[in-house]
Amino acid sequence: MKKFTQLRIVAALLIFAPLAALAQNAELQKVLAEMDAASVKFQSAQADFVWDQYTAVVQSHDFQKGTIAFRRTGNTTEMVAHVKTDNDQPSPKDVLYKGGELDFYQPSLKQETILNAGANIERYLTLGFGGSGKDLAANWNIAYQGTEMIDGVETAKLDLTPKQGAGNNEFTHITMWVDPKRAISLKQQIFQESGDSRTAVYSNIRLNSVPASAFALMLAPGTTKVRK
C-alpha cells in the first residue's frame, strides 16, 4: 500500500508541475504585455529613493537617500539622481546620465567627474522605469515569482538572470518588484558574485511631470571638471 501511495504522489507531481509552470508563464506573459502597454505612454518619472549597499566582506550596510528622475528622449533615456544623505548624515552629490556620459558632481569638493557610461547602462536605467516587457525579455531570462504588495501597490516579483552575450555580466541576478500597469519598479535587489548586493526602494512616484530643465547639474562657480 505504501508503495502505491508513493507512486500516486509521484504521478501527481508529474502531472501538476507542468501545469504550474504553464500558469506561471501565462502570468509572466500578462505582466510583460502590461509593461509593453505602459511603456508606450511613459515620458518621465520622478521618485524618492533609499539605496542600501551591502558589502559582504565586512558585513556592512551603507544607506543613501535622495531623489531620482528619468526622462525618455527619442530612443534614449536620461537619468538624474540627487543623493541627500549618507547613513542619515548630510552628504550631497549628484549623478547625471545623458548623451552616453555619466557626470558625477561632488559639491563639497567642487568637482565634476565625467565618465564614458558604456554600452549597457541604458539596459539598467530602463529596467525599472519605463522599459517595455519586450526589451526586458530580450536581455534577461525572467522567472515569475508571484505578486507582493509594496506601499499599497500590487507588484509582480520578477527574478532576472543575464542572457549569454547580452552584456549583463556585472551581476549574477536581479530581483525586481514591478507595477506592470505603470512599467515602474518599486523595489530592486541587485546581486553580485562577491556576495555584495544593492537594494533600492522607490516611493512617492510621479509620472510624466518632470521638466527637461531637471536633467542638468547645477554646478557651483569654480567647479573643476575632470574627464576620465
What are these regions (language model features)?
Residues 1-11:
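Bacterial N-terminal signal peptides that target proteins for export
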Residues 13-16:
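Sec-dependent N-terminal signal peptides of Gram-positive bacterial secreted proteins and lipoproteins
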Residues 19-23:
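Sec/Tat signal peptide C-region and signal peptidase I cleavage site
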Residues 26-104:
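N-terminal mature ectodomain segment of secretory-pathway/periplasmic proteins
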Residues 43-45, 64-66, 77, 91-93, ...:
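Envelope-exposed proteins and targeting segments
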Residues 91-131:
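Hydrophobic, well-structured mid-protein blocks that either form specific transmembrane helices
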